[in-house]
Design a protein with these regions (language model features):
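Walker B catalytic motif
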Residues: 160-161
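The feature captures the beta-strand-to-loop junction immediately N-terminal to the Walker
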Residues: 33-35
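A short, flexible loop at the N-terminus of ABC-type nucleotide-binding domains that lies
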Residues: 2-31
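Conserved beta-strand-loop-alpha-helix hinge in the C-terminal portion
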Residues: 212-250
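Hydrophobic anchor residue at the start of the ABC signature
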Residues: 145
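H-loop/switch region of ABC-family ATPase nucleotide-binding domains
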Residues: 191-193
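Helical segment within the ABC ATPase nucleotide-binding domain
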Residues: 170-184
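ABC ATPase nucleotide-binding domain signature region
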Residues: 29, 44-108
Length: 270
């Protein structure tokens, strides 16, 4: 279980994740599904060591996800908040929208992996001469991916970071991530609401329901609905799986206008 601490005396803690358990072998590509507010972002932050959990119940590669700082050398976490905060490598109090040359950002890290950097620059279509105050949202996202992926990772946590990418860059990125899992044994957990091109990508699926609990998890080969849709030649099995599960929740519990992440309230259909 994971709960955010209460802000007022006597107020109950806000329980976000309930009886959650995820186990993935090296080389897995896990697609994380769920409605807005189901706890996907919270889960990824817990795995990324961004939230302190009670005891040592959350382990990544056999060690405590929060307390073992060495994990940050082999664990990467990318979300949509990048570029919205001040960061050390750009200088104290200097936002990413300032006049910064892409080639000079995290220059030491880039220089440690020149071949990987050059591969990502070509893959993502990044120009090292770009200035951060002149790039579009999609270009800024490409820069984030370049800097976040240049160091080889053992586990990669992605929270909807492909939303701004054009279709070609997104497709090439997903193929590259698949290669990383197959050749280096890296593990990827990817939360998204965009399912085009993902029908054959994941090895595993994990569905978070409205309670922040596991609705279904396991290898794709064990999901009967997926096998049925592939047999029927459905044009987009992953999209159909997501809409089937989400609409079933709406039918049972009502329309979601607040979820586990505290984004509002839940409104009944009746």
């Amino acid at each position: 279980d994971f709960a955010y601490p209460s802000s007022l005396p006597g107020e109950d803690e806000h329980l976000v994740l309930k009886n959650f358990c995820m186990q993935l072998k090296p080389g897995s590509r896990c697609l994380l599904l769920g409605a807005n507010g189901s706890g996907k972002s919270t889960l990824l932050k817990v795995l990324a060591g961004k939230h302190l959990t009670k005891g040592d119940r959350v382990k990544v590669m056999g060690t405590d996800a929060f307390r073992d700082l060495k994990l940050n050398l082999t664990r990467a976490f990318l979300d949509t908040q990048w570029g919205m905060r001040t960061v050390a490598f750009a200088g104290y109090g200097c936002p990413l929208q300032a006049d910064i040359r892409v080639g000079g950002m995290m220059e030491k890290l880039q220089s440690q992996y020149p071949e990987r950097r050059d591969e990502l620059v070509k893959l993502l279509g990044v120009n090292p001469e770009w200035r951060m105050h002149r790039v579009s949202d999609g270009q800024r996202r490409r820069v984030q991916l370049l800097l976040g992926l240049v160091r080889p990772f053992d586990i990669l946590l992605l929270d909807e970071v492909t939303t701004c990418l054009d279709v070609i860059v997104r497709q090439d990125l997903m193929r590259w991530l698949q290669k990383e899992t197959e050749t280096r044994g890296a593990t990827v957990v990817y939360a998204t609401h965009i399912f085009d091109g993902l029908d054959d990508w994941p090895t595993h699926l994990h569905y978070l329901n409205r309670h922040g609990a596991t609705g279904w998890q396991g290898p794709m080969g064990e999901l009967a609905l997926y096998a049925q849709l592939r047999k029927e030649g459905h044009p987009s099995p992953m999209l159909k799986i997501a809409t089937t599960w989400l609409r079933a929740e709406i039918a049972e519990f009502g329309v979601a206008v607040e979820g586990a992440d505290g984004e509002g309230a839940r409104e009944s259909k009746n």
